[in-house]
Each structure stands twice: as C-alpha cells, then as structure tokens.
C-alpha cells in the first residue's frame, strides 16, 4: 500500500506510465525485429504474387483483423478523463473507508461518461440517460461508483433488465432506430411496466439532453450502506453536484448537433481539459440510519424512487476534478471495466434487487468483452493497492507468480498470502440478519409507481413542463401501434391530466381546441384548458397552461414540490466552459472583437470568430482578425451564444448572405443569448427576430430584450459585460415570440 499521501494523487498516472510506449526512431514488428520496408509486401518479382514467407505482412494484417473487441451491451458510446478526488469533510462517524475519512488524501480517479442505448458510433446528443461511472484508485483497492445522471431507474428488479434493453435497442427485424427510444418496442415495454413512470418523466425532460458532461449531476442510483468503526450502518445515496450548474440543450438543437458534430460532448470535455477549464463536481451523501428507513412512505431499496432532499439533505463532503485527458482512447476509455462490486471496507450493499443483479452482471460482462478473467491486470483497471492472491493462468496473463504454492491454506509457502483481519483492513461484509422464505414476489412497499412521477412533474418550471410534453408528443408520434399510444396516455393521466391531454391532442386522440386568430392570425389563442400543440419551438400558450398543472403526490414523504429537481433554480453565476460565435467579415471592428475575447477568456469562456473563409480577416482599422470557423463548417447549435460586432463593411457583407441570418434566428429560437454592438445591430434588425422584437436602429445605450443585448460601439465594455451576465442565465425561456421564428 502506498503510504505517501503527497504522491497519492499521481500514483495512478505513474502506474500507467509503466505501460506507456513512446514512439521510437526505428520501426519494428511486435517482436522487436527492425523493419526494412513497410510499404510493399514481399513478391515473386515486381508484378508477381505475394509470398507466404512475408512474416511482416502476415503479422500486420493479422493484428489489424483482430483489433476490434465487442462493444459494451449498454453504455457503448462513451468518453473518459483522469482526475482527482479530494475529501474536505470526514465521514468517520459513518464509515471506516479511508477514502471517505482521511481529508489529507488526494485519490486518483478515472471517469467514463456515456449514453446507454446507442452503439459505439452513435451521436453524443441522443435523448438518453448518461452514464457517470467513477473509478477511484484508493489505497484500500478500487472503489467503483457506477452511476447515471438520473437518480432513479426504469425497473425495480434486475431480472427485467434484459427485457428493458431489448425493447430500447434497435428493433431486431430491421435494426432501426439507432440510439433512439421513439419506436414501438420501447414504448410497448414501458406502457406495460408502470414502475418506469418516474424514470420516464426524467428521460422525457431536459435532463436527458445535457449541454455538457460538466453540466450534469451524477447519482449512485442505489442505496448502499456505510459501516463505521462500531459496526453501525447507515443507508447512503451518493451524489455528484456540478460546479458549473445543471444545464441542457433543447431537442431541436440536440438533433441538429447530432448531424453537425456527433462528437459534441466528448469534444467539449477534451477541449475544456486541454484549455485548463477543469470540470468539477461536489461529492455529497444522503444518509439514513439503519432502523429509521421504515418511517418514510417510500422504500429506500426501490431504485425507482429518490430520497427528497427536503427530507434527507445532501451533505457535500468532497470534490471531483477532471484534469487530464487519456493518452489512448482504446487502452483507457474502451478497456476500463467498472463493477458495482468494487467497494472498500466501510462500504457495503443494500438489498436493492436491481443492485443485486448488477453485482453479478458487471463481473460477467467483462469476460465476453475483454476476453479473459485477467482483465483486472489491464493498466487502466489495475489498482494502486498491492495485489496478492492465488488466482493463476488464463488468457493473456501478465503477472509472473514465482513459487511452489497457489492455494490457501498452505505450509510450503508460509501460509501466505494469508487472510487479513478486520482490524488490519480486511473486508468484512455487514452482518445483516436475513430471514424469510424463498419467494418470487415484489414487496408491497415498492407498489407506488406514480407518486414520485407527480413530484418530478410538479417541481418543473413552465418551460421544463413544456419540454416534457413536447418530448412525449415527439416520441409517441413515432409509435405506429395505436393501442400502445393509448395505453401510455392512460399512464400519463395518472400523473397529470393536463400533461395527458396536451400529448393526446398532438396524437389525435383528443379534439384540438378551436383556433382564435389574433393579430393577423400569426398566433392562435385557444380556449382555456387546452392549448394548440406547436412545432419544435416552445408554445407560449402551452407553457402558460402547464405552469399551474400540479398533482397531489404520494411516496414522497409529504413533499409536493422539490426545488432540487428543477434546473431552473440552479446557480447561474458562471459562463465557464461556454463557447461564443462571433460573426464577422472583412471590415469588422476588430477592437470590439478583442474586447469581447478578453472578457470571455477572463470568465473562462471561449470566443470563436465565424467568417466566410478560414485564415484571417482584415479589420476596419487594418489589423488582422483570425478566423476559427466558417459558416460552412459550423452552426449556431454548436455555440452557447452569438455576438455580432460592428463594422460597416463587415455587416454589409454578412447581410447579403443567408447563413448569418440563420445563425441569429436559430440561436434565438433555441433561447440563447444574442449580442450586437454598433452596426452589428443592423444585422439583427434584418433577421426575423429584428422584426419580432422591433429592433431598428443602434441604441444610444445598452438595451436588453428577452436575452438580446444591443449597444453602441462606444459603449462596448458595458455591452460585453451585459452580454456575459445574460449568458450566465444559460437560456432565455421567457421569449414569447420564439414559436414564430422559422429556423
């Protein structure tokens, strides 16, 4: 065991360095033979057949033919990063786990983020749960916290997991659709599985469309146990709370990103770490003393239920920082193997039936994916703690074990390696008393399937409810079998009647309200109680209808609404990690570009100049302005905000093209911050949003209308600061005319 705490944070990196091969000047084959020619195979004459004794050709092709390994059955699409875990408040009253009690330690970690349903080559921005798996290389062995960005799950018992995944994956007769749940088999299963209703509300919400991995929460999902030095146990749920806040994409935006940049999330993570904008999360725990769990009206062993934070607060005790990208994706991110059974002394399992099944599945799946029981010897998986046991042989064994004995007990080897007492750090399972007959039944305490779905719905803001409704309208409209749609509407009616009716109207199951034209019939105002569904944009009438739509909850400890469940009330004081598109052409006011870039950099954000061509533009004052992207290889959906600096020549050129107009209008439709200074306001005025917002001339002072910031060139510093403040809000859902924008 490494006892040098000062070096502990780098201990895994040092371990990986032992397996890292740096490029050398001379080319060799796998057995060290220096290669004279790597361009041509060995032939009988210049135009003759290739020869069998070309061992280099055979080795090269042979290795290439076997490079691929089976992808993960679920969570195939993923990306990862190295980092460090620091504890700043000891949990010694609750556990003996060193990693959770010693505040002087810096524990190395590897984190893998992933989608669930899609294949390894699918897009990052699919509507899906995100895996949030953390491997902590502790001095007592590896601890894997294999979680998600959603605190609950679809099912209560692991025996249903194969059915869930079979239903969610592409339908077997045609292998369609990829990385999508909007199809018959998924919703058929869900409609027949009421326990999934709480999870469905989360998946249909913006939580399943994170803006960035660094802007989503992580949850251990299950109840675990912490055991202290006196043997007393507490049930615990683990949390990761992002320092950057919780923020999302919108569905139309996510679909477009999937085409423009399917690697959007992994690129964002990689670039943030390379720039030193290290993603951070607070580590928190919810704790319930064993014996007190029965006082709640929900079962702490039920993975479809959360513990309301108003009842059991999250105690923040540590921090996770990701600060280093992998050196090789396959060797690290693809070959890393997580297991829920990787726990350390002081952490144990609960009787959650979903967790119990995962404890088998994760060990079992590594054999088929990595091909050998020796997968723990792979560099990314091996612990920094000493390994000493009697496991031997198997495919691709790395360890050389000298000596005569490979069994215990033994006398020929000094009875080593020997058992370790609890006092010396040996793992001892919690002595839970287990009584009961063998039965295949579900506990009655698992029986409430709608109460916490109502809690989640009640807790959403108006725009968040609108997005849930639109997601269900989209997903169920893709279901071709009518009785499945109808069955789902029955479930939605159990959650909230207005939720059900708005989805039903879009599916043609309820007569839509009669339209009432106003202002030239541009917008329809339906009668009270129903709202006309709109397209991809938020509908003001529907938001107004849904904001007051609430239901009485059950299985929630009496809590009717939880602020912890809504993203709307989270911190909005930072733009760290955000990206801004600066639209420009020759003649741009370069001093305005410089002022914006400097302010954004100071705030931890990035500005990219988007122009008509790569290279550089000539500013109005003759100075060069570097172009980062073009209108052909970028899009507004790849940015968090848009800024248009002034410059008569630049704006004249941009106004003659369609792409800049689309950039602005699409960003407005997606509720993003838009800024313009000087003549840049003229471009906004020429777009659809200019007509809708009444933008006409350059204002004499900085103005803000629904997240659109405008100001004069002489007031650029104030414009930029107002722009940054507006960006920190992430999105401007209050826009009333967004549904009229075509983009």
PLM features: what roles do these ranges have?
Residues 650-652:
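Short glycine-rich, flexible loops that bind phosphorylated cofactors or substrates
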Residues 699-743:
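A charged, well-structured terminal subsegment
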Residues 1-590, 594-597, 601-602, 606, ...:
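Active-site-adjacent core segments of small-molecule enzymes
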Residues 481, 611, 641-647, 660-687:
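Catalytic nucleophile loop
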Residues 590, 662-666, 687, 694-696, ...:
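C-terminal (or distal) subdomains of carbohydrate-active enzymes
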Residues 630-638:
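Short amphipathic alpha-helix with an adjacent loop that forms part of the alpha/beta core around
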Residues 626, 656-662:
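Charged helix-capping and loop-helix junction motifs
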């Amino acid at each position: 065991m490494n006892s040098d705490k000062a070096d502990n944070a780098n201990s895994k990196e040092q371990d990986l360095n032992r397996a890292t091969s740096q490029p050398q000047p001379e080319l060799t084959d796998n057995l060290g033979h220096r290669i004279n020619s790597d361009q041509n195979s060995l032939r009988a004459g210049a135009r003759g057949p290739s020869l069998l004794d070309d061992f280099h050709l055979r080795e090269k092709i042979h290795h290439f033919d076997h490079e691929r390994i089976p992808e993960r059955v679920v969570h195939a699409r993923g990306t990862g990063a190295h980092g460090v875990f620091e504890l700043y408040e000891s949990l010694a009253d609750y556990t003996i786990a060193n990693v959770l009690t010693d505040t002087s330690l810096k524990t190395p970690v590897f984190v893998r983020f992933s989608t669930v349903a899609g294949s390894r080559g699918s897009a990052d921005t699919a509507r899906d749960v995100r895996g949030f798996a953390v491997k902590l290389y502790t001095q007592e062995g590896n601890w894997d916290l294999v979680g998600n960005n959603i605190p609950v799950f679809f099912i209560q018992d692991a025996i249903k997991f194969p059915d869930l995944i079979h239903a969610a994956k592409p339908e077997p007769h045609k292998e369609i659709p990829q990385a999508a749940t909007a199809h018959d088999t998924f919703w058929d299963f869900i409609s027949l599985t009421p326990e999934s209703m709480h999870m469905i509300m989360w998946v249909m919400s913006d939580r399943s469309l994170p803006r960035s991995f660094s802007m989503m929460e992580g949850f251990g999902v299950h109840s675990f146990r912490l055991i202290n030095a006196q043997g007393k146990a507490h049930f615990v749920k683990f949390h990761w709370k992002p320092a950057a806040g919780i923020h999302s994409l919108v569905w139309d935006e996510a679909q477009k990103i999937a085409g423009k940049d399917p690697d959007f999330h992994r690129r964002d993570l990689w670039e943030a770490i390379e720039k030193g904008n290290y993603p951070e999360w607070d580590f928190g725990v919810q704790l319930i003393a064993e014996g007190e769990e029965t006082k709640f009206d929900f079962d702490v062993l039920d993975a479809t239920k959360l513990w309301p934070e108003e009842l059991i607060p999250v105690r923040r005790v540590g921090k996770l920082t990701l600060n280093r990208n992998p050196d090789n994706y396959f060797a690290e991110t693809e070959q890393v193997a997580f297991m829920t059974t990787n726990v350390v002394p002081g952490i144990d399992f609960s009787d959650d039936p979903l967790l119990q099944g995962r404890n088998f599945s994760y060990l079992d799946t590594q054999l088929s994916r990595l091909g050998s029981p020796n997968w723990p010897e792979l560099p990314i998986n091996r612990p920094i703690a000493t390994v000493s046991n009697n496991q031997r042989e198997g495919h691709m064994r790395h360890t050389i074990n000298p000596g005569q004995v490979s069994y215990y007990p033994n006398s020929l080897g000094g009875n080593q390696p020997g058992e370790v007492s609890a006092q010396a750090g040996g793992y001892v399972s919690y002595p839970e008393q287990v009584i009961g007959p063998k039965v295949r039944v579900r506990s009655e305490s698992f029986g409430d399937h709608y109460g916490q779905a109502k809690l989640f719905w009640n807790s959403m803001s108006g725009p968040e409810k609108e997005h849930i409704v639109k997601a269900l309208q989209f997903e169920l409209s893709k279901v071709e079998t009518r009785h499945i749609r109808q069955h789902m509407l029955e479930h939605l009616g159990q959650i909230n009647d207005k939720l059900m009716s708005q989805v039903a109207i879009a599916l043609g199951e309820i007569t839509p309200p009669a339209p009432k034209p106003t202002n030239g019939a541009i917008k329809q105002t339906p009668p009270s109680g129903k709202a006309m569904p709109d397209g991809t944009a938020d509908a003001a009438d529907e938001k107004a209808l849904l904001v007051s739509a609430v239901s009485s909850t059950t299985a929630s400890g009496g809590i009717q609404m939880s602020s912890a469940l809504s993203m709307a009330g989270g911190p909005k004081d930072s733009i760290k990690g955000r990206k801004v598109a600066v639209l420009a052409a020759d003649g741009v006011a370069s001093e305005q570009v410089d002022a914006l870039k400097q302010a954004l950099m100071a705030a931890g954000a990035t500005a990219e100049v988007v122009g008509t061509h790569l290279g550089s533009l000539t500013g109005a004052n003759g100075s060069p302005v570097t172009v980062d992207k073009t209108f052909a290889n970028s899009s507004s959906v790849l940015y968090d905000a848009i800024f248009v600096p002034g410059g008569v020549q630049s704006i004249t050129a941009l106004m003659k093209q369609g792409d800049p107009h689309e950039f602005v209008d699409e960003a407005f439709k997606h509720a993003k911050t838009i800024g313009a200074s000087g003549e840049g306001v003229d471009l906004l005025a020429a777009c659809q949003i200019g007509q809708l917002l009444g933008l006409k001339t350059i204002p004499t002072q900085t103005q803000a209308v629904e997240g659109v910031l405008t100001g004069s060139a002489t007031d650029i510093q104030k414009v930029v600061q107002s722009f940054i403040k507006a960006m920190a809000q992430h999105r401007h859902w209050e826009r009333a005319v967004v549904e009229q924008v075509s983009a």
